[in-house]
């Protein structure tokens, strides 16, 4: 979609399993003012501060997806309203949620903190672009976990902030048009 100008997709033969793997690579010639940096330079994954004795909502994945009513806990790791949580355990590792209210972070999450010089929605689009790869490369056998090493190593093309704003606007516009098309099918 909008990332076509800075990404190209190639198929590579996986010599070990005879499968074709999708690889997203960067063009070597980026526009002036752009740079490619690892994800770990743009954001961090943390746990909230431990609190005990205060009744607050449990912000677990089922609640955040609207699949379950609100439950409360009297202890946990604090998350402010409008924080970003990234799913690090389970089938959908790499999925990001914005908390509608303050509460305790679910046990399958880490808080996602994005650097101030990065447009939040720009980085969320980049993370979403890599969700398939993150899901397919989980670690752990009983409960699959987000491969944090892979996540931190994702190479992100970073344009100047005003370009990030334009890219986000273009992506949102394209998604709105696609939604309109889907509604009219």
Predicted regions and their residues:
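A short beta-sheet element
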Residues: 65-67, 75-128
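Short, solvent-exposed loop/turn positions at domain surfaces
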Residues: 30, 72-73, 140
């Amino acid at each position: 979609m909008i990332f076509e100008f800075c990404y190209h997709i190639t198929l590579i033969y996986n010599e070990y399993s005879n499968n074709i793997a999708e690889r997203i690579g960067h063009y070597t010639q980026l526009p002036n003012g752009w740079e490619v940096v690892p994800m770990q330079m743009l954001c961090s994954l943390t746990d909230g501060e431990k609190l005990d004795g205060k009744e607050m909502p449990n912000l677990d994945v089922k609640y955040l997806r609207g699949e379950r009513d609100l439950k409360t806990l009297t202890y946990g790791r604090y998350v402010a309203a409008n924080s970003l949580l990234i799913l690090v355990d389970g089938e959908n590792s790499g999925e990001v949620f914005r908390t509608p209210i303050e509460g305790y972070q679910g046990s399958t999450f880490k808080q996602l903190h994005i650097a101030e010089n990065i447009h939040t929605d720009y980085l969320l689009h980049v993370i979403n672009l890599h969700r398939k790869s993150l899901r397919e490369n989980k670690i752990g056998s009983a409960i699959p976990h987000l491969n944090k090493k892979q996540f931190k190593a994702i190479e992100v093309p970073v344009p100047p902030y005003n370009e990030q704003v334009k890219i986000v606007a273009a992506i949102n516009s394209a998604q709105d048009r696609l939604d309109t098309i889907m509604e009219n099918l």
